[in-house]
Structures are given as structure tokens and as C-alpha cells.
């Protein structure tokens, strides 16, 4: 782990050294010039998928942090600075590293950056993380096929492991679960841990699960995904084992 500063930019890398191109790593234009952009996905902004296995050991996803809602129309990507470790990208980096070290199937964090404005009051943020290969988000997959009972149970066990660590995924929904096709079968991953973190007690855990169920029910109507009450029963049975 290597943390350093260049002028008004702060970096953390999951390596024991720095890179001359540290700042360029967080610019899509740099990767486009290198002809290393291998795909992209649209959300609040564009996430770029990068061919970086020869540099970082894995291919990466590059994401810039954008605000949502009405506030996002007035201020699309600036956040108030209070402490480095609580900035959006550094906080997500450290949480992903904690979960990765605990053995949960989450993307390995590669690097994070914040860039302060001239007055040092606000900052912009970016993160580089592992790209999960041969994977689709659950909603895309469920538009074309059903999942086995074992895969639904795998999702339930995964969420239980997360909750046992007292980590609340505040945006737990069907889009933030990836299903990867491997030689051993389907493997489920959790992604997008922005604004997530540790939460004490247990009252919130069923609320978190119910949030996930509502997202499935919403996508049944919106995207015509294949989801049944039996699927949910299999998921929750594994969660409660």
C-alpha cells in the first residue's frame, strides 16, 4: 500500500511503489491514447474498462464519482473535503480492501485519487478497481435465463457474510450483484460500495434484505426479469442458515 501527494492531488495505490503516470491513470483520455480501453458502461457517468493486466495484474474499471439527484444537476462532481480517509474514493478503496482481505468476492481495489480545488474546500474523486471478467449484472442475466437454486443460495450466503462483518451495502440492489461464468460454474460478486460502511446492531439487516427484494420486484415490471417468490425463499433460506 502506497499513499502519496502531488500538489493538490492525493493518491493511494495497492502497491509498494509510486508510478510516474499516477495522475494520468485516472484520465480516460490517457487510456484511449494507449489503446487500452476495452469497454465501458453507463451509469451516472461512464465507467471505462481497461486492459491493464500487464501493469497491475488484473484488468481494471475506472470510475469518476458523480452526484445524483437534484443536487447533481447543480454540482455534478464536487464534494466538501473534511478528511482524506472519509473522501468518497479513499473510503471505498479501504472498504473494498477490508472485504477483499476477508475473502468476500468483491473487486480488488487498485488505486484511488482525490483532487482538491484551489481553495481546498472541495474535491473530485476517482477510483481504479479490478474488472470482473466474464460477468453480467443480475438484471441483465435474468432477462434471458433463470438462475439455479444453488446460485440464489450463493447470493444469500454472500449477503450474510457481509452482514456478519457489520457492513451495510446502502445500495444493495440487483444491479450491484454480478454473476461470473467460470469453469466451476456461476460465481456471484458484490460491487459498488460507494457510501457503504460499518453499521452497529442488527435492526438494519432485514431492511437491507428487503431493499434487495424490492429491487427484484421493480425489475420484474421494468425489465421483465425472471424472478419468483421461490427464488427469494432460496436466497433467504441460505442467508439464515
Positions of predicted regions on the chain:
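AlphaC helix of the protein kinase catalytic domain
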Residues: 137-145
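Conserved catalytic-loop position in the HRD/HxD motif
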Residues: 166, 171
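C-lobe/activation-segment region of protein kinase-like
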Residues: 182-241
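Short, low-complexity Ser/Thr-rich regulatory SLiMs
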Residues: 116, 179-183
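Juxta-kinase regulatory segment immediately upstream of eukaryotic protein kinase catalytic domains
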Residues: 1-38
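Conserved alphaE helix
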Residues: 150-158
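Conserved ATP-binding subdomain of kinase catalytic cores across diverse folds
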Residues: 25-136, 160, 164
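Hydrophobic residue at the +6 position relative to the catalytic HRD Asp in the kinase catalytic loop
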Residues: 172-179
Amino acid at each position: 500500500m502506497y499513499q502519496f501527494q502531488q500538489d493538490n492531488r492525493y493518491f493511494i495505490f495497492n502497491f509498494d511503489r509510486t508510478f510516474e503516470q499516477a495522475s494520468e491513470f485516472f484520465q480516460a483520455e490517457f487510456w484511449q491514447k494507449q489503446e487500452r480501453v476495452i469497454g465501458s458502461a453507463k451509469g451516472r457517468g461512464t465507467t471505462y474498462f481497461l486492459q491493464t493486466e500487464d501493469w497491475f495484474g488484473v484488468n481494471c474499471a475506472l470510475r469518476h464519482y458523480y452526484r445524483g439527484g437534484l443536487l447533481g444537476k447543480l454540482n455534478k462532481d464536487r464534494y466538501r473535503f473534511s478528511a482524506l480517509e472519509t473522501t468518497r474514493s479513499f473510503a471505498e478503496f479501504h472498504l473494498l480492501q477490508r472485504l477483499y482481505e476477508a475473502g468476500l468476492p468483491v473487486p480488488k481495489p487498485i488505486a484511488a485519487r482525490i483532487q482538491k480545488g484551489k481553495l481546498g474546500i472541495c474535491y473530485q474523486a476517482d477510483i481504479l478497481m479490478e474488472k470482473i471478467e466474464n460477468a453480467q449484472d443480475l438484471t441483465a442475466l435474468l432477462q434471458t435465463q433463470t438462475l439455479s437454486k444453488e446460485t440464489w443460495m450463493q447470493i444469500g450466503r454472500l449477503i450474510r457474510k457481509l452482514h456478519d462483518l457489520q457492513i451495510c451495502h446502502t445500495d444493495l440492489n440487483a444491479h450491484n450483484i454480478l454473476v461470473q461464468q467460470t469453469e466451476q460454474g456461476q460465481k456471484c460478486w458484490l460491487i459498488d460500495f460507494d457510501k457503504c460502511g460499518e453499521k452497529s446492531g442488527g435492526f438494519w439487516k432485514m431492511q437491507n434484505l428487503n431493499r434487495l427484494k424490492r429491487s427484484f420486484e421493480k425489475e420484474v415490471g421494468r425489465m421483465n426479469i425472471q424472478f419468483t417468490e421461490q427464488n427469494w425463499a432460496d436466497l433467504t433460506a441460505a442467508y439464515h442458515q
